[in-house]
């Protein structure tokens, strides 16, 4: 290339008249922009650029609306209020998007924001939109006082924390349109009263509704949060691992152990068996057993079953639900889900529910699929046991009445029996009741005076009840007549009918009290004089088993034996001894001996095979001798007398 023909870049560099530019090692075009790191104090402006820029720099719509970056109103908002985080974020966004237009502008020194004051910023009457924004900011300045103190969140008010979280939520949206829309919703939310549902609450409810449209999501929510009153206390009791640690290591008081120490404990406990089919079947079986025990405690039927052990139940149980309680029930037909309703009737192991939704008919629902609408009232298990015991005659003791002892949680005791033992001096001293002590009780014709008083009261109460029933029948007939003529009953008739019902209820209560008193005397004075001569062998055997259960229960109060199999074996052997004593007081037959042999055979089948030899040596040998003696005396005598 010849020297006469030069490139435009070299020509522009040689024709320049600026000495500073000729000394620069870089040759730039006239329209080039000089980076800030290569500029000196004087900014280089190309002639073409300066000619084009005749007025103020180009502004974004937001800057034109708000008066520009250097607007006094915006600066005052920045200095006087910390609620303008959203406005500052918008300004930063605009400055970053238009950085090329302001690259040659001098850098602005902004004052650091101060703590928010409860002062109103000066409004800008020239712009209506800006005035609305300023009014909104003025309305929320007092709510966000303390928002600048981010280094110490403990000093922040609840409103400040809420606003900070809201601002972080707004920052998730990138465009100005989305931020403006969310700010509008935020303003609407702040202007609402406490009774209205907030915008964010509606959004959360909509998200939750969309989630619950899926069947698996509904199933997960039911399994995770829907607990019946019975299951809630079972699943919320002490962790199984904590129970095993407490029972296996009673002297371990410190739970802050190292990883090596916990590893040693896990080795001693062994490998757990979980997530297998057998494991889940056993867990379901244990859960159903606990449910059955809780139902028996509610009903009081545990007194009739000696095999029920209450020590594995929770220390507190919820109060049983009654008719009229509002509940949430899990149903599968005609709809599958959880619906609200009211208990209409109580049935065994469930309730009859009338639902609020008219499309669902009244349904029988199990008690394990019902959740009370409200707070559960928890009561001690000893309360339910005392309620069940109070319904029994005072002469009849419960067969099993074991509750937790707060001082010894691994032992069980009967509260009512322990009280009576403390007063009487021990289980073998006999009951200490004045009705059994002939010296202190007043007798009239060989009958206790209190027994006769109860009998007279009961007779009078029965006569009164007959009159009330007769009066109630007449009122029912009048009600049918009035129902035929009109749809309403007179106020006087309603009051008379209600008074009759209340009187009848009071009479029934008094009758129950006197009947219990008569039953008490009957149990006390006829228990020792029961004639077994006319009783069948099976009835005698059952009576002896019940007496043996009472003896074992009383004697176990001081020993606190927890092995159920051992207690059952002791009870069976005691029943055999009582049966032998009963047979020794009368003439027996071959049927009685057969009944005794059946009892011994049942005991032999219940014990462990390793103990059969001991049972034969120490029990059956003596029973064989007794059997021989009875055959020679009682049974043969009975046979001879029958022949004569």
Curated annotation (Swiss-Prot):
Pfam families, alphabetized: DIRP, LIN9_C
Composition skew (Basic residues), residue ranges: 50-62
Keyword Transcription regulation listed: yes
One GO process term, biological-process aspect: negative regulation of vulval development
Superkingdom, natural source: Eukaryota
KO phenotype (gene knockout): Decreased protein levels of DRM complex components including lin-37, lin-52 and lin-54. Double knockout with the programmed cell death regulator mcd-1 results in 100% lethality during the L1 stage of larval development. RNAi-mediated knockdown in a ced-1 mutant background results in reduced somatic cell apoptosis.
InterPro entries membership: DIRP, LIN-9/ALY1, LIN9_C
An example Gene Ontology CC term for this record: DRM complex
GO terms, molecular function: DNA binding
Ranges where the record places region Disordered: 1-77
Functional description taken from the UniProt entry: Synthetic multivulva class B (synMuvB) protein. SynMuvB proteins are required to repress the induction of vulval development by Ras signaling and probably act by forming the multiprotein DRM complex that represses transcription. Required for the development of sheath cells in the hermaphrodite gonad and for the development of the male spicule, rays and gonad. In association with the zinc finger protein ztf-11, negatively regulates the expression of non-neuronal genes during neurogenesis.
Family per record: Belongs to the lin-9 family.
Subunit structure: Component of the DRM complex, at least composed of lin-9, lin-35, lin-37, lin-52, lin-53, lin-54- dpl-1 and efl-1. Interacts with zft-11; the interaction is required to suppress the activation of non-neuronal genes in neurons.
PANTHER family xrefs: LIN-9 (PTHR21689), PROTEIN LIN-9 HOMOLOG (PTHR21689:SF2)
Descriptive protein name: Protein lin-9
Native species: Caenorhabditis elegans
Gene behind this protein: lin-9
